[in-house]
């Protein structure tokens, strides 16, 4: 019998109803790393109201050709001023890290400059902050039915409108999110 732990790097975490933390209601989190040392993920379903990628580049003094009116996402409650770019594998500049052979994550100004100049990855999204778990914490939340794990598709990650990502991710996993409940029953 294989007793090796299951790690969720490269998967999507979907918050279940009644997760118990309002910051994570309807969250979709792209897992960047998960191992015996803990876990880190970036939220991809909660745009920060009024904040666009173009505005962030303007704040950083990075020129850009296009308006770049894509939203910036609340990546999580940890280090909310730290930026991350989750992107396709067709760009691998300074500090780009491959995540489970699926997508990449970068946090340097190099990728922001590349996006501003129109030479960045073909698919990307920008987030501020991240969700982090200490060793064993995420596993404990899984036991308490806080999260559902699913592979999720690149189309879900990059093309689905943020307001639909949570429900669409469940649908991809074969689950009708409208039928999820916080109530349990007895048999």
Curated annotation (Swiss-Prot):
HAMAP family in the record: UPF0301 (MF_00758)
Cellular component aspect of the GO annotation: cytosol
Protein name from the UniProt record: UPF0301 protein Sala_0165
InterPro entries recorded: AlgH-like
Superkingdom of origin: Bacteria
SUPFAM superfamilies in alphabetical order: VC0467-like (SSF143456)
Protein family membership: Belongs to the UPF0301 (AlgH) family.
Signal peptide residues on this chain, from the entry's feature table: none
């Amino acid at each position: 019998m294989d007793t090796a732990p299951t790690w969720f790097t490269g998967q999507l975490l979907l918050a279940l109803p009644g997760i118990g933390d309002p910051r994570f209601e309807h969250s979709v989190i792209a897992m960047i790393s998960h191992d015996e040392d803990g876990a880190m993920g970036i939220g991809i379903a909660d745009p920060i109201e009024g904040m666009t990628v173009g505005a962030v580049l303007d704040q950083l003094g990075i020129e850009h050709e296009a308006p770049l009116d894509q939203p910036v996402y609340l990546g999580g409650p940890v280090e909310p001023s730290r930026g991350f770019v989750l992107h396709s594998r067709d760009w691998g500049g300074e500090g780009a890290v491959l995540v489970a052979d699926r997508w990449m994550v970068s946090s340097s100004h190099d990728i922001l400059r590349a996006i501003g100049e129109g030479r960045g990855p073909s698919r990307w999204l920008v987030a501020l902050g991240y969700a982090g778990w200490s060793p064993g914490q995420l596993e404990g939340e899984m036991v308490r039915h806080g999260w559902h794990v699913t592979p999720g598709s690149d189309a879900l990650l990059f093309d689905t409108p943020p307001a639909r990502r949570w429900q669409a991710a469940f649908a991809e996993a074969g689950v009708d999110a409208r039928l999820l409940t916080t109530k349990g029953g007895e048999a």
